[in-house]
Amino acid sequence: VPYVLVASISKSNIDQSIVAFFSFSLVASAGYIFNDALDKSADQKHKSKKNRPIALGIIKLSTAYYMAFILILCGISLSLMLNKYFSFSLIIYGILSYTYSFWLKRYAYIDLFILGLCYLMRLIAGYLVIDLQAPSPLLAIAFTFFISLASLKRYIEMSDNSLKNQKIERRGYKFQDSRKVLFIGLTTGFILPAFFLFETSIFELKWFLLLILMALGNLWYRAYKKNLDDDPLYSFLTDRFSYITIGIGLCLKIYS
């Protein structure tokens, strides 16, 4: 995101960003491994997650935890090559992510807030690594967008008719909560960001915000029609409409 919105980036910034990318990816991957290990029994009953290596038993739990700790050490070690603010943001992200996996994901609606914060920390870290301050309106927009994305993921899980009248394992939701999650997702994803369209101080962000709303609207529409993969991000990256949106964004950036 910083590269899209910032006018010019130096070569040193690019080099630092590459290191930061791998550093954050390693720490984030550890979180996903923890999550899969803790969700093993639930994933084994899921129609698509049952094919994950840990759920299948290809990777033992002890091996998974060992791998996760190695990734954390490698990620933090890489971050020490960068400025202290990035390292601090990485540690905060790790604490939020791992606390979510081990504990907070069991609490309905709180988990959406924590997931939104985790995604937001990635954006903040992207600015910190190149010694820039992220615009406050952008952070507000991004946070509501990420909560909507987290709500979308939960909504897809609860749209499974086989879960009717059941509580989702290791989650604080029931099948009947899908409408509440839908309301939260639409409110945070569209109504709140729409107010920023009338904020003149972020005029340069309006085209970016409009494209995000278009892409998010397409995802929610497909989820409502039950035509979306369990992973909204995967669906976004494999959707033709998403590429059209990205193409429009690049054209606007180049010719602006």
What is each stretch, according to the model?
Residues L120, I124-S256:
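C-terminal membrane-associated helical module and adjoining short loops/tails
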Residues V1, F21-S29, Y66-S77, M81, ...:
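Generic alpha-helical transmembrane segments of integral inner-membrane proteins
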Residues T63-K105, F190-L219:
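Transmembrane helix-loop-helix
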Residues V1-L5, I9-L38, Y85-Y100, E204-W207:
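Membrane-embedded alpha-helical segments that form the functional core of polytopic membrane enzymes
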Residues K40, K45-L90, S136-I147, K180-L192, ...:
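Multi-pass membrane catalytic core of lipid/isoprenoid biosynthesis enzymes
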Residues F24-P53, I110, L149-S159, N218:
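Acidic (Asp/Glu-rich) catalytic motifs at the cytosolic membrane interface
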Residues A37-K47, Y65-A68, S87-S101, S148, ...:
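Hydrophobic, membrane-facing alpha-helical anchors
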